[in-house]
Amino acid sequence: IPKQGFDKFNIFDEETVNFSERHSQIIKNLSKKEKFFLFLHYTETHRDLVREIIRKEKQESTNDGYYNSLKENSNRYDSYLPACDEYISSIVKTLEECKIKEKTILIFFSDHGTSIGEKEGEKFYGVFTYDYTLNVFCLINIPGITPKNIKKQCRTIDIFPTIMEITGNGEKNSDIQGNSLYELINNKESDERELFVETGGLYGPWPSPSKPNVFCVKINNKKLIYNDTPQTWEFYDLIKDPCEKNNIYKSELMDVINLKKRLRYYLTMNNIEINLI
């Protein structure tokens, strides 16, 4: 996350920090203020995955047992979740102790998912743009608001505009990407929101840590992927093929033609220069 806009920005060693203690103390210090905005980055799950996957597994290997051990890999990931649950409980408890829980808006979200070996070439995340790393959760607790589920596709870039609207700063700056989730929450928006994703892997079949080289556009359960380094296309119907196992790309398909136009739009808008075939 960028430092822009924050009064204070702290970096710490995830190998040694106690997240519950550190973050709870920050909340206690800020609770004396009338208003505050706080972003807490819990990376214990990331740390555990780095220890067990990045440091122990050969990232460039595609013919080892990792890709045949989906159940074991999934169970390993699940074993990290109780610690995450305890962390969240500690944060909520701290808000209660500070007597600010009933006037605090809480937003929990993940920035990405992770691979458990679904696709050869990716053992962690950031290599490809398949849904197992794109789909994430977001929980927003607003005191006094009845719980609702948003089932339509939305994006993490929609979180910031939502915060702006919640806090009464709904007038959107043209430089801000994303849209408030209130239209979806109040059922005033019927269409899914189009998704654009880019990544550049640290490892995998075509690593590109200095610039993105894999891109995708996704809308209405149709998904187009462009892999720039090998210059290959993929297209998936996610209703019929939710695990993205059957690439049905054909350049003459109308869905493909339309999604290519949208991909070009996003590349231009974000000043990304690639040799799009």
Locations of regions flagged by a protein language model:
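Catalytic domains that recognize anionic headgroups
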Residues: 1-277
